[in-house]
Amino acid sequence: MLEVWRAYYEKLSNEEFSWNKDTLTATDTTEGPCEKITTAEVLAAIKKMKKSKAAGPSGVVSDMLKAAGDAGTVWVTDVCNAVVRDGKIPEDWCKSWMVNVYKGKGNALECNSYRGIRLLEHVLKILERVVEERVRRIVKIDDMQFGFMKEKGTTDAIFIVRQLQEKYRAKKKDLWMAFVDLEKAFDRVPREVVWWALRSLGVDEWLVSVIQAMYADTSTMVKLNGKVSKGFGVRVGVHQGSVLSPLLFIIVLEALSRGFRGGLPMELLYADDLVLLADSEEGLVDKIKKWKVGMEEKGLRVNMAKTKVMRCRDGAGQAVKSGKFPCGVCNKGVGINSIECASCHAWIHRRCSGIIGKLKPASDYCCSKCRGGNPGRSDVLQQISLEVGQDLECVDKFCYLGDVIAAGGGAEEASRARVRCAWAKFK
């Protein structure tokens, strides 16, 4: 079993997706004075470290560094400055352990259902925190990036999606959304692209050199049930479990997206969770094509099988009480139990809908007239041909950043999902 995991992670950590390296345009380096790392920066980084965290191969834990006091802070500062001066990290910092964490979904017997977390040396993480703070002071990340940004979080992105749904419904306009999935984004991003992105956003060359030193000659060993595999090199991707990796990844997305973003910001990003928004199907097609081509040129890959499309419109899949509209089948006034046909937009009685039992939200329901006498869910609306390699599934609800977004708007579906999760804890 240990060798199976070793073979899986060795392949994942050393193979890039195919991409054209000629797309990396030459960028000017930002030369500046190399500022020494101060004890105040190191002390602030140590204070941010959590206690009782798993250690790397050396066995040094954060609790030891916190207990070392002023003498330990000075020693760590000297080591970090030596790395900056020499452009090389200690050999022990290059090694790590790889442990499995189940993603919470998928077949538990498949390797793809697990995320490999690297247990790095805690002294290295101190240097990463110092470098991260300095890089954040230099780069300007777009306001539509909510992942790993100060004073931003998942609730902000979810709030914006719901507000857009309400505004579009108020104006009787359709809102098209694409929830784009990036395949193995952190594990497969080429490191040449990372260095290019840092330089493109104006990061000082000495900082780029320090980050490159952190990734030079790195290796890891799989740790499973108290046993450790043979070591293997890691040549692709950013470190899962690293303090600096999230910032490096959003810098990559920021740098490559500047080439095809324009006009009003009609996209939301939370690290590798991307939502594209448009007023029409054609507009959404154009956005998906631009992002897909732009990211795949730089070594990232869009997982089209997991990318979903949602058409948000007023009354999508909802049962309403209204006597103003005739039933699309029998022409009598509709009542409480009615549903809108997604094809002809007529309201249909429950008894004429062909649905047995209580009506449920279904944004792709079609009446018997539109289905040639066989009412049901529309085959046409379940998939939308976007001409980007394959058809994308059109859904009426989607779990985005832990919350449920429904095509009809509102938070009812999210509330039901939370109630179901709560009841599941008692089973």
Q: Residue spans of the language-model regions?
A:
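Surface-exposed loop/turn segments and immediately adjacent short secondary-structure elements
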Residues: 1-112, 118, 126, 399
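Conserved catalytic palm subdomain of right-hand nucleotidyl-transferase polymerases, strongest
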Residues: 52-60, 98, 109-119, 156-199
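Catalytic palm active-site di-aspartate
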Residues: 56, 95-98, 115, 145, ...
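Catalytic palm subdomain of template-directed nucleic-acid polymerases
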Residues: 66, 184-201, 274-298, 313-317, ...
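Active-site palm subdomain of RNA-directed nucleic acid polymerases
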Residues: 131-145, 221, 246-277, 335
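Short, conserved micro-motifs composed of acidic
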Residues: 302-322, 374-394
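Basic, alpha-helical interaction scaffolds
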Residues: 322, 384-427
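PHD-type zinc finger and closely related Cys/His-rich zinc-binding mini-domains in nuclear regulators
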Residues: 323-379
